[in-house]
Amino acid sequence: MLGSAGTLLLLLLAWGARALSQPDDNRITTGRNQDLNAIQQDLLLKLLSGWTDSRESNLVEVERNVPDPPEPKIPPSVKFPRLSLRERKAPCKNFFWKTFTMC
């Protein structure tokens, strides 16, 4: 999934962490430990930056492949569509025949 370079970086990172976790038997000095830490940090940063770059490029490609949704074709609505004069004056509910309207 990560590719051969990513796998190599992970193996180097795991190997370095395992070597540092073992007790110091005067084979590795403090300066070398610091060098290994710096190398591990660099490798980890390269791995993560490559991963985020590929992830961003995949997102951009996915965005390019998504077609724009078609705009709905809704006719413009009329403010008062074919209502009688009384209904246009009072667009409320009419109670009873020829009596009053209630808003």
Curated annotation (Swiss-Prot):
Keyword Disulfide bond recorded: yes
Keyword Chloroplast: no
Family matches, as InterPro entries: Somatostatin, Somatostatin/Cortistatin_C
Coiled coil: none
UniProtKB keywords: Cleavage on pair of basic residues, Disulfide bond, Hormone, Secreted, Signal
Stretch forming the signal peptide: 1-21
GO cellular component, one term: extracellular space
GO biological process annotation, one example: adenylate cyclase-inhibiting G protein-coupled receptor signaling pathway
Any one GO molecular function term: G protein-coupled receptor binding
Subcellular location: Secreted
Primary localization class, coarse: secreted
Bridged cysteine pairs (disulfide): C92-C103
Function summary: Somatostatin inhibits the release of somatotropin.
PANTHER family: CORTISTATIN, SOMATOSTATIN
Similarity-based family: Belongs to the somatostatin family.
Protein name from the UniProt record: Somatostatin-2
